[in-house]
């Protein structure tokens, strides 16, 4: 993965266009965002969770920071497509989060719409990161034929999960 802007990782400066250490970036962000996303999810859907202002501050600050890193790492075009695809995939996100809530005996309809903003944004950021990791693990980012195949498998896998 080639960086879209300068980024310092563990005190080492990586310049725009240089390859980033994907074995650091993906595990770090998957774990870090997983923890923040999980805490945001649990707070949003807890029986006696925090008020909406705290939920938005907790999630909003972290989500903003993640988007800034995504822009530096993946670039504006990829991040733009993340939000376009998220807009198109809201139904899938709705189904997936509703299924997760069902594991706790709850549903999306049990909460006001405003509560869903933070968990939905975390879901979008996390699935974007998974797709980027898959493109790099399969070395298909710069190979159009392989990239189309990997993306098709990603879409089919997502549809299987939504189904």
Question: Model segments located where?
Answer:
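N-terminal juxtamembrane cytosolic/stromal segments of multi-pass membrane proteins
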Residues: 1-40
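Alpha-helical transmembrane segments of integral membrane proteins, especially early/N-terminal helices
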Residues: 12-23, 72-89
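Cytoplasmic membrane-interface regions of multi-pass membrane proteins
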Residues: 67-83, 129-147
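C-terminal halves and exits of single transmembrane alpha-helices
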Residues: 87-131
